[in-house]
């Protein structure tokens, strides 16, 4: 069976891993890095992904970051006159990770396990699955990030019984999950989180601080200057990382703006204490879901065996201190917070292919599911933290006499009134036979699959008429839209490959021009001048083609010059060999002469032994 790769599709960074020899391994990208920035840039119809896209974000307004925060919404970003959905941008990142995996494995990759924040709702999960399809991947399973981290951690510890808290503070989302490990079973007991809290928010408080300080000093608001804001974002991210290792850092941004007297520079020392002061509210926001998860699991903090930190933002000392204070446990530092989720996804891929045996994963639905009933009340059918996959049915009736149809309004959330929860979808069960209110028996069934994706069925028990819906959120893509995006992604991948080949061809041509100059110089006076002239003429023809950027002409001229240079190189080699042979012959004659000169005449006398 072909390999199933594990992908951590992160807000700020993404990572891909695979099972090899019974161990999950992170696949490095072409630059040799183990994580890839979740950044996409468009420049003259060319798409750039990762570090190269992030590097030019300051000067390129068509750079898209943190798109994961918009998954499952109707948000669109316009680039070069075309609208892109979050699914399409995520698909470009996934294509890049898929290409890295294919280069590493030396085979085509078509299947993946992709992770999502535990607190992602149905629309966000469906959007992630669609992104995978657009990227040309069959998404075999969507699993929760904290659960994936626990899988990677617990793979070697299957014989131990442990209660684990996974605290996952990523670039844009926060999750906390409580799990029990026993005999290879990873059972999620509860989960909680905040999909609008992460490292980006810690960057933002530093940016706000820098903007306020600069405004106080120069009366200029940098937040209105797009380019200055991007420079501030880069500086804030760097300062945040620095302050995990040192107690103060220098932020220096020359020529950040200009005043009446000329250019203005931003120079500021940020201490860890100041950073902790301005980010204290964010750290506190992570503790409420942590307490809720513990309460839902029915565990006291003292019952926990391990606290595992996941996500780059857990390197912040104040975050580590807060979770230590809350649980009374020193956080476990034996996993790499940037890679452990992708490793866990690879383990789940191994479970699905049969490469990993004896592992059972029992996850939960993070939010309650139900329908709207009379008076706008939210009636729950499946409570949050129910183990999935699961199915639950309940019988309802009509609210008016002779009601011909019922509207089924499907919701997800925890609030008592429907209006305060997230609408997943609506559908109708029609053609109900006339009957007094309260008489028809309408059975509503909710199914949640292993990916956490919802199907809802309504059935009139009197007539057996049935209506089924796979929840498609307002932002959800139809199959036709996904198919169109798949084709676009494939054609763009072909175009990207073509552009890559073009760049390589130009590079090879430039290299050949340089090599020709060197060979011609080495052969001056050693071969027929006509041959040198022929090489020079072919070189100039290639240079002209390079300047015109005529790719087919470059290819033809390059091949012609290559042949001439090869012939000249052979001659150069033969001359070098001949010269070496002559030198050897001369040296041999010299050595022989030297031996003759050194001959010594000696007299000898035969001595006969007496017998």
From Swiss-Prot:
The keyword ATP-binding applies. This is Chaperone protein DnaK. Gene3D superfamilies: 1.20.1270.10, 3.30.420.40, Actin, Chain A, domain 4, Substrate Binding Domain Of DNAk, Chain A, domain 1. It comes from the Bacteria. GO terms for molecular function: ATP binding; ATP-dependent protein folding chaperone; unfolded protein binding. The modification Phosphothreonine is found at residue 173. Residues 579-592 have a biased composition (Low complexity). Residues 579-611 are annotated as: Disordered. Keywords: ATP-binding, Chaperone, Nucleotide-binding, Phosphoprotein, Stress response. Induction: By stress conditions e.g. heat shock. The keyword Acetylation does not apply. HAMAP family: DnaK. Belongs to the heat shock protein 70 family. Residues 600-611 have a biased composition (Acidic residues). Acts as a chaperone. Pfam families: HSP70 (PF00012).
């Amino acid at each position: 069976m072909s390999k199933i790769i594990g992908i951590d599709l992160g807000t700020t960074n993404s990572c891909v891993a695979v099972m090899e020899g019974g161990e999950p391994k992170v696949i490095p990208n072409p630059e040799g890095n183990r994580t890839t920035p979740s950044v996409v840039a468009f420049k003259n119809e060319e798409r750039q992904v990762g570090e190269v896209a992030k590097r030019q974000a300051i000067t390129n307004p068509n750079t898209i970051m943190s798109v994961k925060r918009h998954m499952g919404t109707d948000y669109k970003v316009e680039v070069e006159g075309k609208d892109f959905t979050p699914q399409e941008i995520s698909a470009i990142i996934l294509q890049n990770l898929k290409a890295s995996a294919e280069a590493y494995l030396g085979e085509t990759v078509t299947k993946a396990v992709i992770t999502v924040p535990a607190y992602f709702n149905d629309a966000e999960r469906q959007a992630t699955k669609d992104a995978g399809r657009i990227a040309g991947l069959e998404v075999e399973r969507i699993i929760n990030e904290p659960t994936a981290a626990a899988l990677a951690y617990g793979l070697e510890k299957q014989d131990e019984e442990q209660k684990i808290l996974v605290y996952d503070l990523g670039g844009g989302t926060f999750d906390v999950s409580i799990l029990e490990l026993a005999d290879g079973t990873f059972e999620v007991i509860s989960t909680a989180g905040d999909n609008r809290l992460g490292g980006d928010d810690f960057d933002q408080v530093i940016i706000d601080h820098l903007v306020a300080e600069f405004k106080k000093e120069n009366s200029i608001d940098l937040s209105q200057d797009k380019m200055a804001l991007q420079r501030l974002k880069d500086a804030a991210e760097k300062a945040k990382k620095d302050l995990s290792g040192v107690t103060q850092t220098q932020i220096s941004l020359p020529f950040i703006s200009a005043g009446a007297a000329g250019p203005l520079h931003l120079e500021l020392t940020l201490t860890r204490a100041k950073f902790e002061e301005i980010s204290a509210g964010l750290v506190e926001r992570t503790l409420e879901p942590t307490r809720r998860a513990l309460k839902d699991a029915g565990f006291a903090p003292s019952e926990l065996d391990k606290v595992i930190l996941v996500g780059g933002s857990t390197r912040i000392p104040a975050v580590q201190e807060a979770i230590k204070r809350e649980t009374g446990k020193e956080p476990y530092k034996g996993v790499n917070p940037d890679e452990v989720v992708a490793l866990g996804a690879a383990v789940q891929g191994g479970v699905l292919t049969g490469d990993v045996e004896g592992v059972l994963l029992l996850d939960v639905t993070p939010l309650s599911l139900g329908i709207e009933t009379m008076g706008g009340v939210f009636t729950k059918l499946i409570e949050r933290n129910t183990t999935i996959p699961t199915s639950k049915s309940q019988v309802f009736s009509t609210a008016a006499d002779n009601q011909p149809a019922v509207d089924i309004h499907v919701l997800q959330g925890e609030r008592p009134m429907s209006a305060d929860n997230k609408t997943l979808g609506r559908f109708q069960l029609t053609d109900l036979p006339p009957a007094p209110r309260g008489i028809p028996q309408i059975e509503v069934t909710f199914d949640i699959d292993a990916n956490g994706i919802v199907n809802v069925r309504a059935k009139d028990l009197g007539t057996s008429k049935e209506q089924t819906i796979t929840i498609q959120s307002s932002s959800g893509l139809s199959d036709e839209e996904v198919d169109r995006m798949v084709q676009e992604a494939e054609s763009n991948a072909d175009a990207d490959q073509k552009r890559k080949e073009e760049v390589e061809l130009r590079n090879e041509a430039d290299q050949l021009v340089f090599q020709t100059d060197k060979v011609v110089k080495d052969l001056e006076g050693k071969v027929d001048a006509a041959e040198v002239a022929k090489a020079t003429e072919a070189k100039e023809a290639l240079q002209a083609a390079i300047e015109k950027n005529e790719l087919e002409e470059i290819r033809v001229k390059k091949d012609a010059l290559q042949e001439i240079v090869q012939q000249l190189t052979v001659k150069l080699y033969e001359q070098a060999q001949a010269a070496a042979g002559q030198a050897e012959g001369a040296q041999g004659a010299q050595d022989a002469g030297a031996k003759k000169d050194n001959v010594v005449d000696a007299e000898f006398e035969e001595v006969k032994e007496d017998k």
